[in-house]
């Protein structure tokens, strides 16, 4: 009897090809499509950039499932998504941090709520179109390093990895699109999602206004304490940001955000580099020694740097072997040994 796999089918090319590859390997596939926010969000807004989980994605996912003759289930996760992802996003922003909701969506929603539904339906495995690899119960980067998504999957608990299949991890994005073309999948050339599903076009101001969250303006000050302008609200800025709307006579970058005083500290470029950080809320994949060397990635588009790590049981004390720009509280740090993911956590 063939193993049963629940494929997280978004309506994009990656998950469509993952579904196709698993069918070709002889698995018995069921498609699971999740709805994170109400369709009205996409209907009432003029959205410029592609986002996931929209009504058009649902339509595409239905067509893909129909083409391959597999059962199709829509899973409504709006309530748990609001509780675990949107509310977290708001609270972290109000605390002066820069959160990464996609990281936690993979843990709580895709490989949490939806995975639980699929397994309770009798699925043996859950699969997605993510670019990463799981080998012998361990998480690794994809072979295509440009498209690798192990950074975002490093929130998934270790014990779940044995139940997850990532067929795309062995292929390049170009090859995935070629496979889609040859298989006659209609979304072969569909563009990738660019923005957060609940925050189209990164319209932060409308997002907070619509939820009745009052964002107060405040002062922009230099490291010496001189007021040089006004900011529109702390959530609209992040560490390392340069476009501040103030004329200072030199290039200044956001160095810190002070929630109590509601002010932003700016400084020249060299002052925004750090030599160390602390990381909490750990998700650990291997037995960590008290001290170890690794490379660390501190945001999506970031060149990893080597570091020395001290494991203090509930947190990591990280010493960079070279200065790092814009270490941002609330963002995710993922630690690697070559291609293997060692652990992850939230930057303090």
From Swiss-Prot:
InterPro entries in the cross-refs: MnmA-like, MnmA-like_C, MnmA-like_central, MnmA-like_central_sf, Rossmann-like_a/b/a_fold
Binding site for ATP: 8-15, 34, 129
Enzyme Commission number(s) from the entry: 2.8.1.13
Gene Ontology molecular functions: ATP binding; tRNA binding; tRNA-uridine 2-sulfurtransferase activity
Chief localization: cytoplasm
Catalytic reaction equation(s): S-sulfanyl-L-cysteinyl-[protein] + uridine(34) in tRNA + AH2 + ATP = 2-thiouridine(34) in tRNA + L-cysteinyl-[protein] + A + AMP + diphosphate + H(+)
Name of the featured protein: tRNA-specific 2-thiouridylase MnmA
The species this protein was found in: Fervidobacterium nodosum (strain ATCC 35602 / DSM 5306 / Rt17-B1)
Species classification: Bacteria, Thermotogati, Thermotogota, Thermotogae, Thermotogales
Gene for this chain: mnmA
